[in-house]
Design a protein with these regions (language model features):
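FIC/Doc superfamily catalytic core
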Residues: 1-177
Length: 177
């Protein structure tokens, strides 16, 4: 059974495919139109704006903090009763170095503020911080999806793997322009 959506899709596999297609198109627009550059890096408000932009055509809850507890496998994300204070604490975390930015990214992943679409939204949120704070972005084509998911799963306990993976995929913005 699929999450309730604006498209009336009831098959979860079909919804996942459609969601990926639409959100990738919207992500591209977010970068190409310069909308992303108008947002403040590293805030939960910015993450909500990114999520809303990516998923507003699909879900009514786009850009809204979740109102239910969620888990993936055996991992429970931040409980609802602590979610708002977790987001406030994440907003206050420093973001002036690669390590600080990744630590903030890991904490946001643990918070998982949305019912669906957290990964796509937070990766864009991460790239915005990296771009504005240290002049780099992740070349996601250089990141093995399986290695990334395993590293993210372990990151709340030990973030060295995710830092290593992402540091090796950084692209210097001055080389792009």
């Amino acid at each position: 059974m699929a999450l309730e959506n604006r498209l009336g899709i009831t098959d979860s596999a079909e919804l996942a495919r459609t969601e990926e297609k639409i959100s990738k198109q919207k992500a591209l627009k977010l970068f190409e139109t310069g909308i992303l550059d108008t947002l403040t890096p590293g805030t939960s408000e910015t993450l909500c704006a990114i999520h809303k932009y990516l998923f507003e055509d699909i879900y009514d809850f786009a850009g809204k903090i979740r109102e239910v507890n969620i888990a993936k496998g055996n991992f429970r994300f931040a409980p609802l009763m602590y979610l708002c204070s977790a987001l406030e604490n994440i907003d206050k975390m420093p973001q002036s170095s690669f390590d600080e930015i990744i630590e903030k990214y890991v904490e946001m992943n643990v918070a998982h503020p949305f019912r669906e679409g957290n990964g796509r939204s937070t990766r864009i949120w991460l790239d915005l911080m990296l771009k504005k704070e240290i002049g780099y972005v992740v070349d996601w084509s250089k990141v093995d999806k399986e290695d990334y998911l395993l590293a993210m799963e372990r990151s709340p306990i030990k973030d060295i793997e995710i830092k290593f993976l992402l540091k090796n995929a950084l692209t210097d913005l001055s080389l792009i322009h």
